[in-house]
């Protein structure tokens, strides 16, 4: 019938309400999240100021003021240039502004600073995977979503199911069958 992973993907398609952890065969080797205690790495006053600037930036971005958001993220980065979170968040604002190259540059920096671990890395892999998917680079997207899924991202797990060619085929066949069932008998 297929590999255990293929069977797990089919299980996820036909039983979408099942938690991914309960799907036999879908073993992504989830890594325990190892979050660095930033309070031990960065001076407390600078860390608090950096977080406050990031919060201001997020609020500005949510209000649609991307230029202010980018300015605040830049200030947070200048304050603590070795802190991954601000790069990750600025990447999102840059992407929303249409600066995909700048977003990817920030994501690379965030992933390097995070060491590929923790919440910031999980978000960075998801963002980079989304950019790759939008650019039609599905293999790169799959690799990033796999890394994010191992770090505990349910969104990345759903993206992996959607990127699976068997899932795409099953979804297409299921849509065809459902379309036929919805048509009146005389049209079939």
From Swiss-Prot:
Keyword Magnesium appears in the UniProt entry: no
Alphabetically, which GO biological process terms does the record hold? tyrosine metabolic process
Please provide an example of a Pfam family that matches this protein in its UniProt record: TPR_2
Q: Which PROSITE patterns match?
A: TPR, TPR_REGION
What is the top-level taxon of the source organism? Answer: Eukaryota
Keywords, comma-separated and alphabetical = Repeat, TPR repeat
* InterPro entries attached to this UniProt entry: TPR-like_helical_dom_sf, TPR_2, TPR_rpt, TTC36
Q: Does the keyword Amino-acid biosynthesis apply?
A: no
State the TPR repeat positions: 50-83, 85-117, 122-155
SUPFAM superfamilies per the UniProt record, alphabetical: TPR-like
Q: Where are the disulfide bridges?
A: none
The family classification in the record reads: Belongs to the TTC36 family.
Q: Cite the PANTHER family for this sequence.
A: CDNA SEQUENCE BC021608, TETRATRICOPEPTIDE REPEAT PROTEIN 36
Entry protein name: Tetratricopeptide repeat protein 36
Recorded source organism is: Bos taurus
* Gene designation per UniProt: TTC36
């Amino acid at each position: 019938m297929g590999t255990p992973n293929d069977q797990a993907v089919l299980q996820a398609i036909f039983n979408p309400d099942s938690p991914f952890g309960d799907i036999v065969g879908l073993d992504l080797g989830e890594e325990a999240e190892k979050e660095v205690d930033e309070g031990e790495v960065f001076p407390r006053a600078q860390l608090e100021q950096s977080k406050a600037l990031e919060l201001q930036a997020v609020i500005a971005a949510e209000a649609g003021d991307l230029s202010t958001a980018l300015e605040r993220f830049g200030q947070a980065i200048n304050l603590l240039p070795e802190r991954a979170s601000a790069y990750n968040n600025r990447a999102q604002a840059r992407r929303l502004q249409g600066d995909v190259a700048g977003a990817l540059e920030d994501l690379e920096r965030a992933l390097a600073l995070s060491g590929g671990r923790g919440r910031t890395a999980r978000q960075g892999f998801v963002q980079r995977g989304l950019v790759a998917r939008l650019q039609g680079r599905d293999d790169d997207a799959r690799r990033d979503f796999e890394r994010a899924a191992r770090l505990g991202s349910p969104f990345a797990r759903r993206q992996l199911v959607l990127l699976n060619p068997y899932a795409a085929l099953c979804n297409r066949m299921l849509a065809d069958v459902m379309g036929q069932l919805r048509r009146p008998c005389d049209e079939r």
